[in-house]
Amino acid sequence: MGKSVLVVGAGLAGLAAALRLAKNGYSVHIVEKNSQPGGRLNQLKKEGFTFDTGPSFFSMSYEFKQFARDCGIDLPFRYVELDPLYTVNFSNSPKTWYLYKDIKKLAAQFEEVEPDFEEKMRRYLDKCRRIFHDTVDIVIKQNFNSLFDFGLALMRVNPVHLPILFRKFNQQVNRYFVSAEARRMVSLVAFFLGRTPFDTSAVYTLLSYTEFMHDGYYNVEGGMYGIVEGLVRELDKAGVKITCNTEITGFRGANGRLEAFTDRSGQEWSADLFLANGDAAVFRGSVMNRMAFSPEKLDRMEWTMGYLTIYLGIRRKLPHVNHHNYFLGDNFEAYARDVRINPDTLQKPYYYVNVISKYNDHCAPEGCESLFFVCPVPDLRYKPDWSDREEIAMSIISDFGKRIGQDIVPDILTKTIYTPLEWKEQFNLHRGSGLGLSHKIMQIGAFRPKNYDEEFKNLFYAGASTIPGAGLPMAIISANLAFERMTAVL
């Protein structure tokens, strides 16, 4: 039997790292705080309805394929490409915009508001393509042992991209497009990083390339939780045990080595190597008691937005509503600048709606739909009181009904609401921040919490708040980077 590994947390990065380790001869055990694995990539079942609780689509499918090849398995889930990627609706217009990967089809919708949209979009995406290919292998998919190493890596990036470092996402988009509609829709992807186009670095315009040209977006057959279910099946075949309802609260270690973690009941969990898949910053503070990651120090870091999520089962079909939909207001700039810190933005919220049952009939009873709403909101520093959750949720649901021309309120069969309070409690997210640490320039690469521990040589980290960052493909990459660290130790 190989060296033993304890993985704390059964999020996507934890599951992926565990499988890599098991396939390379390690004896792996996973402990998970919650009642089922998956972390934020989870599932809610209620009254005959099934909901994805977190991510509702994914990109960079080749990272998942490479992971499966590395582990010597077939990809343990099936997926389909989204076309259109999603729709966008503005409150001051009845028009629905369809975001297609086919640039000609996309451009046809902009003829009246953005002359030469196709040519502009191709120039913009070509720049995004060059940023992506000049940075992803050098910066995103590498471990760094020091700031010096990180600096050397950055020096390998084509210097033509240097001006990008001094622009925001919206500023880069505005260099190519003049209409409000084009600017807003092209920059919408910045919200996927948990911030806004006005405070996200222009470096991340590379995401436009990943969505429109490089790979696109995908839905998992049966729902996104199928990724977790597939990995759990493979872990079971590999002899990996998952123990749920086990929250780690303390540790024991000496002479630069971690000896055991302790759970809330006092039981110790020992191993040769340890991997923490909780938030890398929060875990260091709450479990490892590191002063550099105290609540006060964490508050000084930059975090992603909080999220209000609504899981709604209704007694009617919505044939004219797409799988993925964004509903925006007519005050995009003002809203985006205020949404992180001003609770008043919830009076006219922007939100996303996923109709999971659109292509997964089993996720809702016959004649019904399963709807998943996501609304960006201030985190608990700026809105600690969520006693108005019901009022806010119903205002969003009512607005959605008006936008689609169908009052769905009388058809509600089940409704579940998660606020940043629930996200903080269930997943140990700082102040209810939905995606962990933000991706500002001084919080990426070697500036991000390391994926190896500062004190214990046999403790490592994987997940959103360590390298490379948030998102499902990033979790797969994070698992591999942690795996490389761990296998180099022994």
List each language-model region with its residue ranges.
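Helical element adjacent to the flavin cofactor pocket in flavoenzyme catalytic cores
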Residues: 206-251, 255-258
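A conserved FAD-binding loop/helix module that cradles the flavin
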Residues: 464-486
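Rossmann-like flavin
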Residues: 93-200
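Mid-domain catalytic core of redox enzymes
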Residues: 247-365
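C-terminal segments that line or cap access tunnels to active or ligand-binding sites in enzymes
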Residues: 315-424
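N-terminal glycine-rich phosphate/pyrophosphate-binding loop and immediately adjacent elements
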Residues: 3-133
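Active-site-adjacent "gating/activation" loops or surface patches in catalytic cores
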Residues: 185, 189-214, 218, 456-457
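A glycine-rich dinucleotide-binding beta-alpha-beta segment and adjacent secondary-structure elements
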Residues: 179-193, 352, 406-468
